[in-house]
Amino acid sequence: MRHRPSAKGTVRLVGRLEFSAVTEGAPRITDEYRIQVDIANPLDRALPQVFEVGGRIPREGGYHVNPDGSLCLGSMLRQRLILGAQPSLVDYVDKCVVPFLYGHSLRESGTTAFPFGELAHGVAGLIDDYCLIFGVSDEDGLRRLMWLLAMKRRRANKLRCICGCGRRFAACKLHRKAHAARRTLSRLDIKRACQEIWPSN
């Protein structure tokens, strides 16, 4: 891939991405796409934007393309968890971009579509995915849990758990699942995710 001129402060890489991928229940596919990767911040602060620029993927929501033309590679927190605490651009491409493109190639071939699962569009999809990540069942529980996780840990641990068990957050089993995610996710990640879903809060 080559570096191309871009907006001030953004690193833009454009070129062909070749890959060979396979998953259980679907065939191996070797393919290539022309993509553009815009990196505005270090990976530990913000995820890159990725665009398919060869004209193969329609710029429509049904193909998991955002209104600005970038590929919807999954929720922000899910991508963060996939990448781990020390993300690299190579990991980002291998673990987030290639699975998306592999899914599209399967769709083109008529075999199947997005074997790794699909989120609903917009806020509804984010809520569904974050409920799975944190082990809560509805939006209200998610909002209250993410509010706790956005606090300093010492303060949040002393408050009552949002599940209604009557225990302090630190003593509840919900705490263990939530803080397993927090080993990778920062408070800034949580706050940004909250703003995506509830921008007025």
Regions found by a protein language model. Name each.
Residues 24, 77-201:
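Acidic/negatively charged segments and metal-coordination signatures
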Residues 2-92:
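Compact alpha/beta protein-protein interaction domains typified by the UBC
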